[in-house]
């Protein structure tokens, strides 16, 4: 493949992929969702963000925090909210969850 790291994007990865990365020595960055509370598309995660974001982040962190291949958590990629006046508050909210659940 010519790489040593894998970024999963927009959804939690299959456990089998994480186990394979552990076995093969790949590093992983895991990301739980592709948008926050501002829509990228009409039927996106923004519809559920306020209710589910913390639970989904905690679930991701608890599921994969002990896998040696996981070297980084992503709180989002190219999310429209980051450019809004409250974007930094949402980013801080998600960052705080990561630090609370995985203080390493």
Please describe what each predicted stretch is.
Residues 1-104:
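Active-site mouth of glycoside hydrolases
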């Amino acid at each position: 493949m010519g790489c040593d790291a894998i970024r999963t994007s927009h959804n939690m990865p299959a456990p089998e992929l994480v186990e394979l990365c552990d076995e093969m020595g790949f590093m992983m960055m895991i990301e739980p969702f592709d948008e926050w509370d501002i829509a990228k598309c009409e039927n996106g995660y923004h519809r559920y963000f306020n209710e589910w974001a913390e639970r989904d982040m905690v679930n991701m962190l608890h599921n994969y925090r002990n896998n040696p291949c996981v070297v980084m958590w992503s709180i989002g990629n190219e999310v429209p909210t980051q450019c809004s006046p409250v974007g930094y508050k949402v980013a801080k909210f998600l960052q705080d969850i990561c630090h609370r659940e995985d203080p390493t």
